[in-house]
């Protein structure tokens, strides 16, 4: 297995590549990527592939997104310190760690698969992340106890925009969510809540695992 130094050097090259391609544009996202490399959030057998810009397997048949995809969503989110953020689909915990580094306050992330709740908690603890709260539940319904949110980031594809997520946004807040077909083709939507309704911006085609839940796909 590669040692930590080698893993980190490869990861730094990935970050440089994403900057050169104009995918990582802000200092905040760059800093978060350098603080929490993806190899801290995958199983040992996948660490040596963590710098490659592709999704990787995690337990329970799920995936951790490719670095470029995570960076794109974080740049769209335009996170600022002190913002109240909900992530739907914790997975490995990596994205929540990145978010927490930017907002510098408590982050709430919800995951429906118990095995992944435990996996993410272990990863976050090992990485030294203290301000991420992993909740077991149906993320398509959001998490009302900590609403309203400045930004909700969904890391799974929905058949349509889940109404509870819009309800749980602040006015002026935004939802970032892949919406489309059950498998492997969605469009990444940025949904801004205004006092008059919602405004939608389409950021193009993406491929995510399905969002399972009451306001997502059925099992």
UniProtKB/Swiss-Prot annotation:
It catalyses: [protein]-L-isoaspartate + S-adenosyl-L-methionine = [protein]-L-isoaspartate alpha-methyl ester + S-adenosyl-L-homocysteine. SUPFAM superfamilies: S-adenosyl-L-methionine-dependent methyltransferases. The active site is at residue 65. The keyword Transferase applies. It is an enzyme of class 2 (transferase). Keywords: Cytoplasm, Methyltransferase, S-adenosyl-L-methionine, Transferase. It comes from the Archaea. Its EC number is 2.1.1.77. It holds the Pfam family PCMT. It is found in: Cytoplasm. Catalyzes the methyl esterification of L-isoaspartyl residues in peptides and proteins that result from spontaneous decomposition of normal L-aspartyl and L-asparaginyl residues. It plays a role in the repair and/or degradation of damaged proteins. Monomer. Belongs to the methyltransferase superfamily. L-isoaspartyl/D-aspartyl protein methyltransferase family. This is Protein-L-isoaspartate O-methyltransferase. It comes from Pyrococcus furiosus (strain ATCC 43587 / DSM 3638 / JCM 8422 / Vc1).
């Amino acid at each position: 297995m590669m040692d930590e130094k080698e893993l980190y050097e490869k990861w730094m090259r990935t970050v440089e590549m994403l900057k050169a391609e104009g995918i990582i544009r802000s200092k905040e996202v760059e800093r978060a990527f350098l603080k929490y490399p993806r190899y801290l959030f995958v199983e040992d057998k996948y660490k040596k592939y963590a710098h490659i810009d592709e999704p990787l397997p995690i337990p329970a048949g799920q995936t951790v997104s490719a670095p470029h995809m995570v960076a794109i969503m974080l740049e769209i989110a335009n996170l600022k310190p002190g913002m109240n953020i909900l992530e739907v689909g914790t997975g490995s915990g990596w994205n929540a760690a990145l978010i927490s580094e930017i907002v510098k306050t408590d982050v709430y992330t919800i995951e429906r698969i118990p095995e992944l709740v435990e996996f993410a908690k272990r990863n976050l603890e090992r990485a030294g992340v203290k301000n991420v709260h992993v909740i077991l539940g149906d993320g398509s319904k959001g998490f009302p106890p900590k609403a309203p949110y400045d930004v909700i980031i969904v890391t799974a594809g929905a058949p349509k925009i889940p109404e509870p997520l819009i309800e749980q946004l602040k006015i002026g807040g935004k939802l970032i969510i892949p919406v489309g077909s059950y498998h492997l083709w969605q469009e990444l939507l940025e949904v801004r809540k205004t006092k008059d309704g919602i405004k939608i911006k389409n950021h193009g085609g993406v491929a995510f695992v399905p969002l399972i839940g009451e306001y997502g796909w059925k099992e």
